Amino acid sequence: MLASKHTPWRRLQGISFGMYSAEELKKLSVKSITNPRYVDYLGNPSANGLYDLALGPADSKEVCATCVQDFNNCSGHLGHIDLPLTVYNPFLFDKLYLLLRGSCLSCHMLTCPRAAIYLLISQLRVLEVGALQAVYELERILSRFLEETGDPSAFEIQEELEEYTSKILQNNLLGSQGTHVKNVCESRSKLVAQFWKTHMAAKQCPHCKTGRSVVRKEHNSKLIITYPATVHKKSDQEGTELPEGVPEAPGIDKAQMGKRGYLTPSSAQEHLFAIWKNEGFFLNYLFSGLDDIGPESSFNPSMFFLDFIVVPPSRYRPVNRLGDQMFTNGQTVNLQAVMKDAVLIRKLLALMAQEQKLPCEMTELTIDKENDSSVAIDRSFLGLLPGPSLTDKLYNIWIRLQSHVNIVFDSEMDKLMLEKYPGIRQILEKKEGLFRKHMMGKRVDYAARSVICPDMYINTNEIGIPMVFATKLTYPQPVTPWNVQELRQAVINGPNVHPGASMVINEDGSRTALSSVDAAQREAVAKQLLTPATGAPKPQGTKVVCRHVKNGDILLLNRQPTLHRPSIQAHRARILPEEKVLRLHYANCKAYNADFDGDEMNAHFPQSELGRAEAYVLACTDQQYLVPKDGQPLAGLIQDHMVSGANMTIRGCFFTREQYMELVYRGLTDKVGRVKLFPPAILKPFPLWTGKQVVSTLLINIIPEDYAPLNLSGKAKIGSKAWVKEKPRPIPDFDPDSMCESQVIIREGELLCGVLDKAHYGSSAYGLVHCCYEIYGGETSGRVLTCLARLFTAYLQLYRGFTLGVEDILVKPNADVVRQRIIEESTQCGPQAVKAALSLPETASCDEIQGKWQDAHLSKDQRDFNMIDMKFKEEVNHYSNEINKACMPLGLHRQFPENNLQMMVQSGAKGSTVNTMQISCLLGQIELEGRRPPLMASGKSLPCFEPYEFTPRAGGFVTGRFLTGIRPPEFFFHCMAGREGLVDTAVKTSRSGYLQRCIIKHLEGLVIQYDLTVRDSDGSVVQFLYGEDGLDIPKTQFLQPKQFPFLAGNYEVIMKSKHLHEVLSRADPQKVLGHIKAIKKWHHKHSGALLRKGAFLSFSQKIQAAVKALNLKGSIQNGRSPETQQMLQMWYDLDEESRWKYQKRAAPCPDPSLSVWRPDIYFASVSETFEKKIDDFSQEWAAQAERSYKKSELSLDRLRTLLQLKWQRSLCDPGEAVGLLAAQSIGEPSTQMTLNTFHFAGRGEMNVTLGIPRLREILMVASANIKTPMMSVPVFDTKKALKKVKSLKKRLTRVCLGEVLQKVDIQESFCMGEKRNKFQVYELRFQFLPHAYYQQEKCLRPEDILHFMETRFFKLLMEAIKKKKNKASAFRNVNSRRATQKDLNDTEDSGRSQREEERDEEEEGNIVDAEAEEGDADASDTKRKEKQEEEVDYESEEEGEEEEEEEVQEEGNIKGDGVHQGHEPDEEEHLGLEEEESSQKPPRRHSRPQGAEAIKRRIQAVRESYSFIEDYQYDTEESLWCQVTVKLPLMKINFDMSSLVVSLAHKAIVYTTKGITRCLLNETTNSKNEKELVLNTEGINLPELFKYSEILDLRRLYSNDIHAMANTYGIEAALRVIEKEIKDVFAVYGIAVDPRHLSLVADYMCFEGVYKPLNRFGIQSSSSPLQQMTFETSFQFLKQATMMGSHDELKSPSACLVVGKVVKGGTGLFELKQPLR
């Protein structure tokens, strides 16, 4: 036992947050600090300074003046700085601002309706007992009550709500347990936030009818107030009696009406006290956390103000000494600034008191200083203070004091200061802050770190430890009579000799260090190990020896980045003298993602028996064979072993007796006991053993004695084709794979056929090692790996060797000739590709083709250019395939298996076929970011090519090969591709790291409980069964039908290892089997029925005819005919029995057995899919058994029970931290996704967001406006639908003016008149494309375009020109005018603040980039963010410059269309979108007006509607052009009209279906392998598609916008969309993530019934404040927790870590109780 003082006897149960009151702080403070200098000239702390010794010693030399203890024992004491004037509390300043804004300064009441107040109080009260539903019920009661009674009084409302509330509170059974749950927390914070947002806006007071006063905050340090112009005084003010001692709060003076002034903290305080008097009963609920500790006292409004500042003890702001210089701590500097201000203010106040010039509210503050007024005051300090009069000086320094106080709390609050010292917020937040650096991650002892190097002779579960570490790392081992001998020897050896000891801990906890030089001391200690200590209080327990690590001790190894569970595993130590590095077996490299180019790893030595037990049993390498991401194996042998193994097991590899024995011995060096051997395969002329027999010998010796050896049929990685040298003779029914070397057959532990390669001992599924793991467990599979590694190494070392030569890469001469010919052909394919891409006629000349190519390259829309790229790639791909066919594999000089390079590639050792092709055939097409190398503006790809050259070489098609060398330009392309890979690697790490952190912080608490549900740490159920079937991913690998034969083949072993007989004797599957039978019976009966019929339905169908015949007369009642009523009556009159007959026939299908019977308790309760798999397999098995010659020993029933047992054994264990596993399984693969695998869309394809950007969109932002929204709907396969869908596609496609405009001609001239009459004249002629050009694609006619020009485009043009001018003038003269009365006009001002608020809200919702602020991303992010912010600022400046009417109109536009605003970056884009409402329907056909009169009228209309249009003409015949003359007043600034018109033309939308930009028809194959058409749209508008139900199969409509799906189809649909979207992102990169992880993440995100992101806005609903604070924006969450008075139950993992509790997960989920008897 450890000494008693280390034994914990108390545990934290919870933490609550609150604030100290002023009185308590005054009592806690030991000293008032008044001296701004903190050290004197000698560097000693000065009295009353910030390092006064009363606050505790600042370093080890001093003694505390308060408690007279030294630095180690005194924990420090608080002091305080008195402030001469009240200041705002920066912590609560924003709430104070809202309170003042939402209350009336005249009658001191809140301006929100009384109903809202009483409703909120009632809602918060019912939430205190966790009654969630009552919240919505209260809303309903209130709205009904308000409808019924016209204008109820506050008292009536209160009565009505109180009646319901009290009922709820009385019936409450849960007590306060229900309140710390996610849903309740979410609801509470939502209600309060909603209240602040809606009811705290400035509006007219409903009580005293005073106009609204506008409050603005500036720089977080002062409040500017604009008083209302009218004040209504009540005539009867006597009604409100004031209690004694409360000064009557000032109202609003006559003088102040309509003025604007500075609201001092003291007047704000008076006003707040007055509000509190009136509204305190309610505000106490809003600020429940700010109560003083006593239960009676309610919230204290003085919390919003500070009269003094608390000074933390000196030891928490130590002085940093560097040489003989002293550097002060940042906190001290901030406090010093406050003190300097306080001194100045005191002087100023004394001076003003003398001159009697104090402003009215200050008089009582300075009465006490009156007595010394006679003393003359030094006035020299006044020069330091800004401001003309003394009062101004006072106000200015007061504001300065306020901003210095702010800095103490948060240095970001003062935006103007340049050199910033960290405030309290900076100490807590970010990665370097207290929470994340010191509470969540702590440094540890008993750890080691060194470089790793490989070693294939140790076991896979071992780690080689150098002697340096072995003598430093120790383990505290209690001395007992059993181990005393060993420990004595260790003590005698001492700290430097291994195995020794470094220290002995005595019974009372004192430590004796063992001397390295004094052997006598060590012997003395060694002799007394078992003698009990003497002394008065007999200490209990035994001595403990800290002994060195020895062989077989367990160590935890870890390599950063620790991205998933296998990055930390437990290894057994093997001490290797003479080493300085850690030695790691090759097989573990993949798990750690380690290579040996200088990687370092950390080792940790667990210090308790519990920790060791967990490491040996759970974290051991043998148990980590499968990765939790998708259950694939991680450990596997590496390159040389593959080559060696494949060569060794090939037919025709023989060994003599000596060689056989040598190899077997090398493989089984550490086997204890006899080695079983095989008889030789060849007896004459002398005995020889095959390589396969060597492997078999190993296997039967490794498999545990009491288990049957394994049976396995599998495939090798080397395919059967590779072994075939020439064409085989035709044989009927010949299967080329059977008995071939690519088919691996193991029977009873003997390898009979096939080659062993990567597929069997690499990290690949269902190989030999995986099967051993499955049947015999991790220990055996680990030994198989170890022994095979030794064997294959020995084979290479002793007998074989492995090398590559030039001969392996040479190509036969005739193949070379073919290759040369194909390369020559390929140079001619360029023009063909461009023609195909741009669909040009065959006869087109080269110049014409080049011209078109140039147009495509330089045009803004890159689709055509991408198309050319794609066609080129297709062409050259064809050629590279031809070349490869000619040279590989038959064109090579040497063939497999003699060809060592091919052997290496085929067996999976290293390299790929691509590598061999690049060596022997050609390099192929070089690609950058998924496309050919880009062209320069001149049209060349590199300077050495012609512009727009047709040869594929110029586009990066390298026909050279490494064998014969490549040319400089080709080499350059090759290097470009190599560089791209490096860039990606560097950029993607920070992105994916932050993504993973977000997911982990959210899901960390999800753990499987003992009832198999997945719950969050507060007990809220996220899934009833993990992954919806409760299975553990690594255990499910062999539950696939393909692996059933393997399980059947090894029935004996599995039955024994899984204890089948014991299970069957205890578990009775009858209940479940009966249930399954019932389900099958129901399905059998109702197989044909699509619709379920109810009992009454079948009854009415039966008697319908009879009732009709009665011809009943009568009227329809409630929409029911007399016949229906008659039938109802007859149904009610039926007797029980006959009605039961009908009901029985209509009984619903019973629930699946999994949902009725808990799978861990009831045997054979499996999921429906698995049940179906078992059924199918048993039928196959039975059919096979009938066909086969010998009868199988395995009966069908036994096979079924075996599979059911395997399923039950695969259930996930309680305590498994599935949330973390899911987070790691998404985060870890995301680091492998290269950032820039973009998908460049050609003309016929959709743009899709891929990779990490898409993952961030789904998981971290849950954004409502995604970058590439799309819908896809299959088209019905009927003639009618297929015909109509073409026109539908046309109708849904958006048309921009730029797409139908051929060219614009612009002529510019000047018209010079008198002074003011100078004009610029532009003549614009728009020429449109002929109708034939776009007839197929677009749903438009020329006259529609003309109409659009006249009605919309000219207006847009006018607005754009106006904007250009305003921008220009704004830049030219920076407006520096004084604020005029108009600015102060309250209507406009409030409008501004309203908008400002809205913008703030916007910013809240729109995380520009959460992590850039969080310090979690790289520098480039921060730069980019600053840039974004700069741009935002610019926009806001321009808005102000516009004329008001235009602004109003803009507002109108913007509000018009909600869907698009989110991601249109520039205001100008909205102008085009305005059209959207008008053009929902296809454009109306304007009949062309005939006759000169009509034409004139039309021209006149255009000229009249636009002031700046001088003249207008249009094509009256064809509507193919129009010409307009624009006359503008001459300005100093010139702008480019043509670029303006072009950019507008691209933005202006002639016709659109709201939300949809483009439509495509693609052909795909569906699940039944039938071809079908699918309509894909870019953009989303679900209701629009619902109109075409006869063309589109709406039941299979899909969209990638999760919010749209949730709003249309409900949250369960959104859940499936999230799963599918994440799966699709990974699928692009070929990464498989188990669907159970995805379903858990999706379930968590939709837990509250809405789709919430995994970022700091999503964590707001968490019930653990500590979890929120350790995530992001700690200060914000701390503030919230303090104000709400939150309580943390310390259940979430983060909270447990912060306070040092064991996390409630894994082995921490349960407690062990000792039986005391």
UniProtKB/Swiss-Prot annotation:
Annotated region described as Rudder, given as residue ranges: 410-423
Reactions this protein catalyses: RNA(n) + a ribonucleoside 5'-triphosphate = RNA(n+1) + diphosphate
PTM text: Phosphorylated.
A Pfam family hit: RNA_pol_Rpb1_1
Region (Clamp): 110-201, 327-433
Ranges for region Bridging helix: 967-1008
Phenotypic consequence of gene deletion: Conditional knockdown results in craniofacial, cardiac and neurodevelopmental anomalies.
Sites where the protein binds DNA template strand: K431, R436, R443, R1256
Binding of DNA nontemplate strand, residues: R436
Keyword Magnesium set for record: yes
Amino acids binding RNA: R559, D599
Region (Funnel) location: 812-890
Sites where the protein binds Mg(2+) 2: D595, D597
Region (Involved in RRN3 binding to Pol I complex): 475-549
Stretches the record annotates as Trigger loop: 1214-1255
Cofactor(s) annotated in UniProt: Mg(2+)
Chain positions recorded as Mg(2+) 1 binding sites: D595, D597, D599
Superkingdom of the organism of origin: Eukaryota
Compositionally biased intervals (Acidic residues): 1398-1419, 1429-1450, 1465-1477
GO biological process terms held by the UniProt record: negative regulation of protein localization to nucleolus; transcription by RNA polymerase I
Enzyme Commission code: 2.7.7.6
Family the UniProt entry places it in: Belongs to the RNA polymerase beta' chain family.
Function: Catalytic core component of RNA polymerase I (Pol I), a DNA-dependent RNA polymerase which synthesizes ribosomal RNA precursors using the four ribonucleoside triphosphates as substrates. Transcribes 47S pre-rRNAs from multicopy rRNA gene clusters, giving rise to 5.8S, 18S and 28S ribosomal RNAs. Pol I-mediated transcription cycle proceeds through transcription initiation, transcription elongation and transcription termination stages.
Protein name: DNA-directed RNA polymerase I subunit RPA1
Species annotation: Mus musculus
